[in-house]
Design a protein with these regions (language model features):
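Histidine-dependent nucleotide/RNA phosphoesterase domain, centered on the 2H-phosphoesterase fold
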Residues: 2-282
Length: 282
């Protein structure tokens, strides 16, 4: 049974429609990535944020362990948080579809840390050093931004598997403050932040899992790469059909100091400041 919790959509503004169309184009491009670039993760190739799988995980005797490395300086990320009310049923669906085929050669995102990356005050490509006083000032500025944001009503548009093995949920906005607007407000609030950010201004996506190796040989008729790509497409399609149309409400903006590289993705060491969105649409 598909995970549906749909309600009739609210009207959206012209700017939101424009951003929704921009997201559709982005998601179409992401969907083509696996076919255009192949399954790079099967060759232990580059994964997210210019890192390789061996930078992120060790796979020994069928057991996956994240490689936690201290981030110098800590990354300072602003993310929207997806409550476990929504993430847990999605996580369960992901595991039902993918676990039988990958056993432990897969890393499932912690369902208590599902998030949407918005804006970095400092990231691994362009580190921006900050004192404790400056960090507290950044956090206060982010809190002020959150107080002016309206909670987002969002709907899962599609599931995508990238060539780097990241299984993503790609979302659209039904109502509330658009991600592009949130990022623009954070840019203004954090003037020292890197000019080049990691993601498109309109995108709204969250990681569900990372595939780390080949599917179980016992479930494959042959080790042929094209057959594996076909299997990946089939699994993505199964999950897509289960959870497409799933709706959620996002009402928290987090300011996160990631003391370990990709701490949010790998259950690493971090400090989280949680801010409720304060806008009332009444």
């Amino acid at each position: 049974m598909a995970l549906r919790n749909s309600t009739p959509p609210s009207p959206v503004s012209d700017s939101s429609m424009s951003n929704n169309n921009r997201r559709l184009a982005l998601y179409d491009k992401m969907k083509r990535d696996l076919d255009e670039h192949g399954a790079a993760f099967l060759k232990h190739g580059e994964t997210s944020q210019s890192l390789t799988l061996s930078d992120l995980f060790t796979l020994k005797d069928g057991s996956v362990t994240p490689v936690l490395k201290a981030a110098h300086p800590p990354v300072r990320a602003n993310v929207l948080y997806l409550s476990t009310k929504y993430s847990e049923p999605i996580s369960e669906a992901v595991k039902q579809v993918f676990d039988p085929y990958f056993d432990k050669a897969i890393w499932f995102q912690n369902s208590s840390l599902y998030h949407f990356s918005m804006f970095h005050a400092s990231h691994h490509i362009v580190p921006v050093l900050a004192s404790e006083v400056e960090i507290e000032a950044e956090a206060a500025a982010v809190k002020a931004v959150a107080e002016g944001l309206c909670p987002l009503e969002i709907v899962l548009d599609r599931v995508v598997l990238t060539s780097t093995g990241v299984l993503l949920g790609c979302w659209q906005v039904v109502s509330g403050t658009d991600p592009a607007t949130i990022r623009a407000k954070l840019r203004t609030a954090l003037p020292r932040a890197p000019e080049k950010q990691l993601y498109d201004a309109a995108i709204l996506h969250t990681s569900f899992a990372r595939l780390l190796s080949h599917p179980k040989a016992s479930l494959m008729g042959t080790d042929n790469t094209s057959n594996q790509i076909e299997l990946f497409h089939n699994l993505v399609s199964q999950l897509h059909n289960k959870i497409r149309g799933f709706k959620a409400t996002v009402s928290e903006l987090w300011y996160v100091e990631e003391y370990d590289v990709l701490a949010l993705a790998l259950n690493g060491k971090m400090k989280v400041r949680r801010f409720q969105m304060g806008c009332s649409r009444a």
